[in-house]
């Protein structure tokens, strides 16, 4: 088989399964609106949960940072790319979340890959929730450690794995809020079991940080746990991009020595770190935004419960409507778009086979009439 045949067959498999991914060129998108071509859509596919991507103070902080520091960092943080804005942001994140140290990464994907591959050896094991994000499962699979997956959000399933012998160390991996179903992990139970077995817990709280808990401190704070490793990302509630790993002092120093994604990547621009400090202030002071988001979630769920579709058991901004069939989910997404509503159809392999869905994400930027319009169109599609 030639390279051309290999590529052609792989693409055809995705087309045959109605799982072919495409990108849309948009003129601009934020928590409420998306501009594509000449048309404006109500945006129900954004992770901009608090609408901070369009916040004036955050934008001004980036502009001021760019004027002072330029638009790039110029190198890895281990060479010349680590500046005062990076150091200040790390310290403020650590103080806010109650950890001695925070380390910045260019993305949540890079952070998860770096931590799992740097910390584990061949005699270690990684026990991961089977619905963990692709970055976690891929990193675990590529790490030298043995990977075992436990049934989603089932502490008893984790316990059955923990009681089995392991020559090395055990790292349990989960998310605070799961990105496709919007449900939350039972973090207190998972931490209790992990600690009793002498293991460490890693929580990726990409979709919980900024949204849950006092000052938006996230899922772990809300459930009263402090995992040994906490990954937070800035592409959701913070409205920007990037990530940080929160940990103890020796772990941070270890990662600085061994985390290849940290060592060999150009650091985020200092201007971005300036904007993230402004976003952090908005998150900390964002109780009103979080209350607005919760109101939109309650409004949607109350009415969507009457739709002839399975509504996911989510109390978060991620509200999946399960369709099942790949092609039907695409048809409905197109019909919603024709009505001026941007909703994304999520299909395998991103989600398990037979669980194609309309993944609706809500934002504090949405207005009550936006939710009413979405529900009106959904009712029309189903009836």
From Swiss-Prot:
**Keywords noted in UniProt:** Biotin biosynthesis, Pyridoxal phosphate, Transferase
Name the residues that bind substrate.
21, 133, 350
Q: Listed GO molecular functions?
A: 8-amino-7-oxononanoate synthase activity; pyridoxal phosphate binding
Q: Which domain of life is it from?
A: Bacteria
Give the matching InterPro entries: Aminotrans_II_pyridoxalP_BS, Aminotransferase_I/II_large, AON_synthase_class-II, AONS_Archaea/Proteobacteria, AONS_Proteobacteria, PyrdxlP-dep_Trfase, PyrdxlP-dep_Trfase_major, PyrdxlP-dep_Trfase_small
Uppermost EC category = transferase
Binding residues for pyridoxal 5'-phosphate: 108-109, 179, 207, 233
**Catalysis performed (reactions):** 6-carboxyhexanoyl-[ACP] + L-alanine + H(+) = (8S)-8-amino-7-oxononanoate + holo-[ACP] + CO2
Q: What's a Pfam family in this record?
A: Aminotran_1_2
Whether Transport counts among this entry's keywords is no
Question: What EC number is given for this enzyme?
Answer: 2.3.1.47
Q: Which pathway features in its UniProt record?
A: Cofactor biosynthesis; biotin biosynthesis
Where are its TM segments located? Answer: none
Q: Respond yes or no to whether keyword Transferase is given for this record.
A: yes
Q: Where is the signal peptide?
A: none
BP terms from Gene Ontology: biotin biosynthetic process
Q: Which family does it belong to?
A: Belongs to the class-II pyridoxal-phosphate-dependent aminotransferase family. BioF subfamily.
**Quaternary structure annotation from Swiss-Prot or TrEMBL:** Homodimer.
**Protein name, entry field:** 8-amino-7-oxononanoate synthase
Q: Which gene encodes it?
A: bioF
